[in-house]
């Protein structure tokens, strides 16, 4: 666990009356004994391990206390575990020093869990019953004779009726491998496919029995190019440079990896096999079903990480008193939860700019100056400070667009131009000096004055006169997102104007200016979402499609589902261009 992660507060999911530690969701493969090595650091601010004296560590399993042990630098625990998913908790019993209160407790040294290593299974007693095993072993041989496949008699492409009869004739292995291969290859499997898998099964079966045979068959599935790659085959007689429509099975894969970052489920595959997925009504029904599925959380994490630079948060190393790994994680979680609420509740994407609510825990609420929020649990709260509404007031954006010890109006302006307005500035010319390298800049009392000196260079002015005014409106937020009224000894001047002359005087006016051009923001969001969904950069010929999606979404208040449906029904999502000189696969 990160060294600057403070562990003085209760962690959601762990017993009350504890602090810090970790909660690990782990699937144990077999019924067996497992070894757990817990390493504990002496204190969050570098004190020796001797400070662990008197501390107690609670180990819990699925919410029930298993052990209570004195905290030492290294703790070894062995537990007999049943196979399957379990929640392992390792946390400290809260023991505040006499007279301590919340104001001063933050400065007190406290120990923390550094790592938990799980080793095992040791001397397994049974195979156990895990969710993955239940999904794979959809049948079990009734006798040794049933373990041997009855040489592919029926068509392997027919998933249920023929496979049921195969199982009754001793084809349990065939049934298992057929089902797995169909999901893994994202298409019906042929007799030849099954025969190949059964050959691997028989090799493993001879060496170690039925389970070993299935293991070998699965290993063959996992190295098949149809599993490793998303293959899309060109139809016969396609013409170079001409678009063609992908098959329903390929469309199903595009849709599932777009919304779930994973393979199609059986429902989607069944529709694709029938050849009806491309029909608008059917495609809309499946898309809405998938957006409502918990697996759509991957869209929030991956698309949000790509579009809003949330993946870059881990690289930020701000020099700011009180900044911890806890705060960094809370900032990312806030933005993800805002985006998730828009996806789950099918809200307008304009709420990303103008939401009058957000999600905070105690750490983030204190950072923002929000009262009456206690504990590590994230909760939805009303935003009463106009400057904090939407993405522009969130710590994730403000941190990732700053440098270690100051804000960066250039980075913030560039981020807004690229991600909210869709007009990225050109790359800077080579060998441009930093803003504070000139003697004149060294004498300036504020960052804004230094920027004005830098902008005096004609080579720099062309881009900076577009980016800097946007960044200046956000100067009341420091480099870790705290509100301020002064930059050093100079008062903050957040007045500026957009490149079209619109006057600005702070984050509220910038947000209102963006909302006044709501179609521009929605178009940019659509471009980002289509880029993510298609897995390629958009071209000039995609722009009419983007404009059509935005125009149609306006009729439904720019709800998130309207953008997704517009994209999945579009030609760029459903079609592909034959590249010149490519060979038929």
Task: Please annotate each region the language model reported.
Residues 1-585:
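Low-complexity, glycine/serine/threonine/alanine-rich intrinsically disordered linker
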């Amino acid at each position: 666990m990160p060294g600057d992660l403070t562990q003085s507060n209760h962690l959601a999911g762990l017993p009350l009356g504890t602090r810090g530690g970790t909660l690990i969701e782990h699937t144990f493969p077999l019924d067996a004994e497992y070894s757990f090595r817990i390493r504990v650091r002496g204190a969050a601010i570098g004190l020796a391990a001797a400070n662990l004296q008197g501390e107690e560590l609670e180990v819990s399993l699925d919410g029930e206390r298993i052990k209570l042990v004195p905290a030492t630098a290294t703790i070894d625990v062995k537990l007999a575990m049943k196979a399957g998913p379990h929640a392992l908790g390792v946390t400290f019993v809260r023991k505040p020093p006499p007279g301590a209160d919340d104001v001063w407790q933050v400065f007190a040294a406290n120990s923390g869990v550094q790592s938990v290593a799980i080793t095992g299974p040791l001397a397994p007693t049974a195979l156990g019953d895990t969710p993955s095993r239940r999904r794979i072993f959809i049948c079990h041989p009734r006798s040794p004779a049933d373990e041997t496949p009855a040489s592919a008699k029926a068509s392997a492409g027919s998933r249920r009726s023929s496979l049921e009869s195969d199982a009754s004739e001793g084809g349990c292995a065939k049934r298992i491998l057929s089902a797995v291969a169909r999901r893994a290859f994202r298409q019906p499997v042929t007799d030849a496919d099954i025969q190949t898998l059964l050959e691997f099964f028989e090799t493993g079966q001879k060496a170690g029995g039925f389970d070993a045979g299935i293991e070998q068959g699965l290993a063959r599935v996992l190295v098949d190019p149809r599993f490793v790659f998303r293959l899309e085959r060109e139809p016969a007689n396609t013409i170079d440079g001409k678009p063609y429509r992908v098959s329903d099975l390929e469309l199903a894969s595009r849709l599932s990896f777009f919304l779930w970052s994973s393979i199609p489920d059986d429902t989607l595959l069944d529709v694709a096999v029938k050849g009806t997925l491309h029909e608008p009504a059917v495609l809309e029904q499946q898309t809405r079903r998938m957006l409502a599925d918990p697996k759509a959380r991957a869209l929030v994490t991956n698309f949000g990480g790509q579009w809003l630079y949330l993946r870059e948060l881990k690289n930020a190393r701000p020099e700011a008193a009180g900044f911890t790994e806890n705060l960094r994680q809370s900032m990312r979680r806030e933005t993800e939860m805002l985006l998730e609420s828009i996806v789950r509740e099918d809200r307008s994407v304009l709420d990303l700019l103008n939401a009058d609510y957000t999600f905070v825990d105690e750490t983030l609420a204190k950072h923002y100056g929000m009262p009456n929020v206690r504990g590590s649990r994230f909760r939805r709260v009303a935003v009463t400070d106009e400057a904090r509404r939407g993405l522009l007031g969130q710590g994730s954006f403000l941190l990732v667009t700053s440098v270690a010890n100051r804000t960066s109006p250039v980075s913030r302006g560039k981020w807004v131009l690229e991600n909210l307005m869709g007009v990225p500035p050109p790359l800077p010319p080579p060998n441009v000096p930093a803003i504070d390298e000139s003697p004149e800049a060294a004498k300036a009392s504020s960052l804004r004055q230094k920027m004005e000196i830098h902008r005096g260079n004609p080579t720099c002015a062309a881009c900076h006169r577009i980016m800097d005014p946007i960044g200046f409106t956000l100067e009341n937020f420091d480099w870790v997102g705290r509100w301020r009224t002064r930059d050093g000894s100079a008062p903050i001047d957040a007045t500026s104007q957009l490149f079209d002359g619109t006057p600005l005087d702070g984050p509220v006016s910038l947000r209102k200016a963006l909302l006044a051009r709501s179609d521009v923001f929605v178009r940019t969001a659509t471009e980002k979402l289509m880029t993510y969904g298609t897995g390629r950069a958009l071209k000039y010929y995609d722009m009419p499609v983007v404009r059509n999606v935005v125009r149609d979404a306006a009729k439904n208040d720019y709800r998130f589902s309207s953008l997704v449906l517009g994209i999945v029904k579009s030609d760029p999502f459903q079609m592909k261009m034959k590249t010149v000189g490519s060979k038929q696969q």
